Amino acid sequence: MKQAIGHDYYIFYKPFGVISQFTPEVSGQACLKDWLNLKSDVYPVGRLDLDSEGLLLLSNDKALQRAVLLPENKMIKTYWLQVEGHFGQIAAHQLMEGVYISVQK
């Protein structure tokens, strides 16, 4: 990736049990600040769930953040997963067809 003047880019392998933000939601919760000492204008580009681990991109490049995160940009993302228990052909077929995840707060 070509670095624009004044922009910083970092990659971090987020461990299981660490929240993908710099401040904890509850006292004692592990967060990025426990692992990284970056400028205050650097933020994760996306997120990984608390109970997942993987590569996390961080930057202060707002154009990059918009390009990756805005749904209308249709950025293709690939995830690898590990499942516990039985994972049959029906479940595999459903995942290959695509799964709609409804988010309600």
Regions found by a protein language model. Name each.
Residues M1-K105:
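RNA pseudouridine synthases
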